[in-house]
A protein has these predicted regions:
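C-terminal, non-catalytic "cap/extension" segments appended to globular domains
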Residues: 1-123
Length: 123
């Protein structure tokens, strides 16, 4: 339970998850979850390749020749190599990790922690 409730009365037969195609279509959602984790790992890896110094959320790979070349090189592998090799070519490891996502959102988490200090959740 997340402590969130509807702003209006809801009938017992309401089925909001059905509005997302993947639910009634029985489409596996794991790929989207993994893609989100990888997105942050790729971003962090490309920022490191550019020698970016600073918080991850301030790094932009837009217009970077270095980041573009590295990403292009990884994508050129296609299916010729295991996906772990492609991952390693960008981030330097073959492991999936949520650390890059945590690093990206660290300033927001710190702000939220400070903002909510001494607050008690009602649920």
């Amino acid at each position: 339970y997340q402590g969130v409730k509807s702003s209006i009365e809801r009938p017992l037969d309401a089925f909001d998850p059905g509005a997302k195609y993947h639910i009634p279509g029985n489409t596996p959602y794991t790929r989207y979850y993994l893609a989100r984790v990888l997105q942050y790992q790729f971003h962090e890896g490309l920022c490191k390749a550019m020698d970016f110094q600073g918080p991850l959320h301030e790094c932009s790979i837009y217009g970077s020749q270095i980041a573009g070349d590295q990403l292009r090189s990884m994508l050129a592998l296609g299916q010729s190599r295991p996906w772990q090799d492609a991952l390693e070519s960008i981030i330097g490891t073959r492991e999936l990790s949520g650390t890059a996502m945590l690093n990206y959102y660290a300033p927001l988490k710190e702000w939220l922690d400070n903002k909510n200090k001494d607050r008690v959740c009602g649920w």
